[in-house]
Amino acid sequence: MRGVRFHDMVAGCLRIDLLEPVAARIRPHGWHVQIQLDGDGLVDLAPRLAALPVDVVIDHMGRIPVAGGIERAAFVSLLRLLEGGRCWVKLSAPYHVSRAGPPDYRDCAARARTLVRAAPERLLWGSNWPHPSVRDKPDDADLLDTLADWTDDEATIRRILVDNPVALFGFPAAPS
């Protein structure tokens, strides 16, 4: 076990009001807090996340609605959290917010590329398989292809897929 997940959109999960006491309990173990939330809620939650004594992983690029682009207040909050050096963002599940849809989720590209430029060392990728909350399941190969579209080179892809998870989860270093 490496972290504790808060899912602010599903009943029965850890509640956000428990964030600080749970973070204090997991800190001695070197664990992180992982958050899935309704994206615009990040504006109000960001100061609390920034003050936590543990790393924070934000699921699904924050689930921030695409309207408003990279200027949307919640996305600006996400970038500020990344600048703090204790936040990680998963480049995952663009289907939660995309209006353009598969296979390339083009309306999510500007945000993903902005995250890659801002902090490639703080990004993770995940397929979100088995995609529990969507009726029309995406093609996981297409989702992985979007990562190649959002990044500039193979070194950045390796960083996101291999090096960053090694750093966050404490896995043994992968061979080059």
Enumerate the language-model features and the residues they cover.
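Glycine-rich phosphate-binding "P-loop"
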Residues: M1-C13, S133
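Divalent metal-coordination and catalytic microenvironments
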Residues: V4, I26, H60, V89, ...
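Catalytic pocket-lining loop regions of alpha/beta-barrel enzymes
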Residues: I16-W125
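Mid-to-C-terminal alpha-helical segments outside catalytic/metal-binding sites
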Residues: T114-R122, R135-S176
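Small/polar glycine-rich anion-binding or flexible loop at a beta-alpha turn
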Residues: N128-V134
